Amino acid sequence: IADRVEQMVLDVTARIKELRKQGVSLSNLYVFGLGDIVEGCGEHYAMQTFSIEYDLRRQKMIARRLLVKAIRTWAPMFNNVVVACVPGNHGENRKNGKSFTTFGDNFDVSIFDEAQEIFAENNKFKHVKFIIPENDLWLTLDISGTIVGLAHGHQFRTGGRYSHQKAVSWLSGQ
């Protein structure tokens, strides 16, 4: 996965340059983390403990380094950068198969907290803003007059046979 993310950073960079060559004006960048950035080490399904490659510390380290690398690569190309995230179910702090603390006590979100602290230390990245929910499983952003909602798919448990039906059902109840 790390190799694919590193390739994605290069591909996005190339696409930005390509669009600008075509005359497309790009001044704002939005980077979203939609959860499950880490797999966790157990408590989600029976085989999880035996199917992961890295312990939780290493998973968080790899995810943080990839996120920071992406932002460091892209941020100098934009006037404004907004980085936002929502928690996923695999990032939950779990015990005996259940999330036992707050929604905000989530490894997916803590990776973004750590990245925010890293970028806050460097004046070169003052144009990078982070939006990190304190204890919500979702957030909304106004992007150039369009309200955009972010939520991880584990919110959509009921409301239809297909995932898009479940998402619409969940959204209508908000």
Regions found by a protein language model. Name each.
Residues 1-174:
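Extended recognition/assembly regions associated with phosphoester-bond processing machinery
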